[in-house]
Amino acid sequence: MRPFGELEAAIMEVVWSAPEPITIREIKDQLPQQPERAYTTVQTVVDILYRKGWLGRARDGKAHRYAPSRSRDDYTAGLLGEALTTTTDRTGALLRLVGTMDAAEVAALRAALDAATADRRSPAP
């Protein structure tokens, strides 16, 4: 998975932060003012994100409203997964990552690992 470009990332941050589906005009208005971006530029990048599956859309009169199809966590997990493909020692890389986590993060990871292990042990219905 390739990381978002600068404008893709800025648009996704706006959409992820929006409490409800948002129009292209609303996205453009919430982007940082510098550099100034043309409406059509924002529209093109929003359409690219829609075609990539990151945004969903619904018609609202003459406009579309956009909402995230995938979460920030999905994006981060994809980047981490991609990073792990670049090493021959995935375990070592994961252990170094765990070494940077605080106690609450380690506890959450431990709970997720315990749940995943329990799911694998449970016979399928």
Task: Describe each PLM feature range.
Residues 3-7, 60-79:
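Short, cationic-aromatic polyanion-contact patches
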Residues 9-14, 26:
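Pre-recognition alpha-helix immediately N-terminal to the DNA-recognition helix
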Residues 17-23, 36:
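Short capping segments at the starts of secondary-structure elements
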Residues 21-31:
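Short acidic, hydrophobic short linear motifs in intrinsically disordered regions
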Residues 43-47:
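Short, hydrophobic-biased segments on the C-terminal half of alpha helices
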Residues 53:
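Glycine-centered, phosphate/nucleic-acid-interacting loop/turn motifs that mediate DNA/RNA or nucleotide
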Residues 57:
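Short beta-strand "wing" residues that participate in macromolecule-binding interfaces
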Residues 78-120:
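Amphipathic alpha-helical dimerization/coiled-coil segments
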